[in-house]
Amino acid sequence: MSVVVYAPASIGNVSVGFDVLGAAVSPIDGTLLGDRVKVEAGAEAFTLKTAGRFVDKLPANPQENIVYDCWQVFARELEKKSVVLKPLTMTLEKNMPIGSGLGSSACSIVAALDALNQFHASPLDETELLALMGEMEGKISGSIHYDNVAPCYLGGVQLMLEELGIISQSVPSFDDWYWVMAYPGIKVSTAEARAILPAQYRRQDIVAHGRYLAGFIHACHTQQPELAAKMIKDVIAEPYREKLLPGFAKARSYAAAAGALATGISGSGPTLFSVCKEQAVAERVARWLEQNYVQNEEGFVHICRLDKQGSKVTGSEL
């Protein structure tokens, strides 16, 4: 008995919703932009194997890997429910660059916990599992936040609510939009990207932020794509973080001139996203980004759609 779960890349913040909005994306060409985790019966309580394009970026000691932490908290929750934890072997296929702004840690966390839950016949419900995912994300970044794990697990665009026992809810989206994702191949640490933000904001920035976020959510619910795209603006993080991203301002200008609806920083960067209505525009923007924003062979550009499914079982073998 074995199960493999794939968890897709995600855009934290989506520019307009700092720490409260996230979107899952998948390339239109079928490329797996995300991590996979396999869980199978094992001889010992826990064994971890690693594979994938970015395997060399993982800690050498399995007990320093976030997947080990996921197994520990999952075991803790099973004990509370008096469910027996099976001896198992986990394999993390690390396809996502670390520190990329694509929700790399969320991919590993979501794939690991979803696979563990599936392997044990789903003893934890969706909300319980999502709460664990947020806890694990907090272990890495220093504070519990759901703007990557929620869309990665549940799919689509997710708005973080964290009230009445509701962690997040999905926001109606525009399924004909293309999301061009460009990772330059350099690393930006989330901690550094947070440290650069001011401790206090001017009143006019707070008012603008509220208007853009409320306007975006309203436009999504009333299905006004042009208005929604106009509202994808960031006054909280982007003005400060763009100095950490070589070439971002130039890329944003090019994308706008080429016909993109909006361009922003994915999470804390360095990946950027560009929203386009027509595939021809998306392809033009993608070509330019490949030639001008990508800095080394680790970088890449993908034309994506929203991933409405989130994490999913892809079979029993990697």
From Swiss-Prot:
The reply on keyword Hydrolase is: no
Residues binding ATP, per UniProt:
P97, I98, G99, S100, G101, L102, G103, S104, S105, A106, C107
- Similarity field: Belongs to the GHMP kinase family. Homoserine kinase subfamily.
Keywords attached to this entry: Amino-acid biosynthesis, ATP-binding, Cytoplasm, Kinase, Nucleotide-binding, Threonine biosynthesis, Transferase
Biological processes, Gene Ontology terms:
threonine biosynthetic process
InterPro entries in alphabetical order: GHMP_kinase_C_dom (IPR013750), GHMP_kinase_C_sf (IPR036554), GHMP_kinase_N_dom (IPR006204), GHMP_knse_ATP-bd_CS (IPR006203), Homoserine_kinase (IPR000870), Ribosomal_Su5_D2-typ_SF (IPR020568), Ribsml_uS5_D2-typ_fold_subgr (IPR014721)
* Name this polypeptide is given: Homoserine kinase
Source species of the chain: Vibrio cholerae serotype O1 (strain ATCC 39541 / Classical Ogawa 395 / O395)
Record PANTHER family: HOMOSERINE KINASE, HOMOSERINE/4-DIPHOSPHOCYTIDYL-2-C-METHYL-D-ERYTHRITOL KINASE
Among the GO molecular function terms of this UniProt record, one is: ATP binding
The cellular location(s) given in this protein's UniProt record come to: Cytoplasm
Q: Pathway, per Swiss-Prot/TrEMBL?
A: Amino-acid biosynthesis; L-threonine biosynthesis; L-threonine from L-aspartate: step 4/5
- Which class of enzymes does this protein belong to? transferase
Which Gene3D superfamilies did the record assign? 3.30.230.10, GHMP kinase, C-terminal domain
Q: What is catalyzed by this enzyme?
A: L-homoserine + ATP = O-phospho-L-homoserine + ADP + H(+)
The function of this protein is: Catalyzes the ATP-dependent phosphorylation of L-homoserine to L-homoserine phosphate.
Q: Which NCBIfam families match?
A: PRK01212.1-4, thrB
Q: Does the keyword ATP-binding apply?
A: yes
The catalytic activity of this protein is classed by the Enzyme Commission as 2.7.1.39
PROSITE patterns reported in the protein's UniProt record: GHMP_KINASES_ATP
Please provide one cellular component term from the Gene Ontology annotations of this protein: cytoplasm
